[in-house]
A protein has these predicted regions:
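A short beta-strand-turn-helix
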Residues: 3-20
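Structural alpha/beta surface segment adjacent to cysteine/selenocysteine redox centers
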Residues: 23-24, 28-106, 111, 116, ...
Length: 175
């Protein structure tokens, strides 16, 4: 199992020339992703410019709100606010309804009425579907799934373990 190459359609935080790229395939409704979020945020902050972080949607529960949360993040992305919305969605502890999603958008300064309209009309549904299909083609069947420089991270998502794996990847990249 390998992640697909990073494209301009991905949600990327960090420099392209960072020695380590960490890709997360995640789902805003997944309790394991919710639990992993603060660990990943801590790691992102700790490694700074040495780490490029990529988040890819895998809404898989079949619940309508599952896909709606991903669509809400895409609505925010279209306005340059993916990462603030990403954080807002994970702070909702995996429980989202239309009103919570609209409130999350408003909390980061987006227009609530525009968000509601985009979610009701499913403006970003096709984009989320395409991302989900791409994840399946990469062999992703569970969330969260992490890759460090293209290699699947197989350990528990705990800060000391993940940081150690990233440190090893930095050392390997340095030659």
């Amino acid at each position: 199992m390998k992640p697909s190459p990073i494209t301009e359609h991905d949600h990327v935080d960090g420099p392209a020339d960072a020695p380590v790229t960490l890709i997360e395939y995640g789902d805003y409704e997944c309790p394991y992703c919710v639990k992993a979020f603060p660990v990943l945020e801590t790691v992102r902050q700790a490694f700074g410019q040495k780490l490029r972080f990529v988040f890819r949607h895998v809404p898989k529960s079949g619940q309508a709100f599952d896909k709606q949360a991903a669509e809400a993040s895409e609505f925010a992305a279209a306005q340059g606010k993916f990462w603030p919305m990403h954080a807002q969605l994970f702070t909702l502890d995996g429980h989202h309804d239309l009103e919570q999603l609209v409130a999350a958008a408003a909390a980061i300064g987006l227009d609530a009425a525009s968000c509601r309209k985009a979610l009701v009309e499913r403006t970003f549904a096709e984009r989320v579907r395409e991302l989900s299909v791409a994840a399946l083609h990469s062999g992703i069947i569970g969330t969260p799934t992490l890759f460090i420089n293209g290699a699947r991270y197989e350990n528990r998502i705990e800060e000391p373990l993940l940081s150690a794996a990233i440190d090893r990847a930095i050392e390997a990249a340095a030659g």
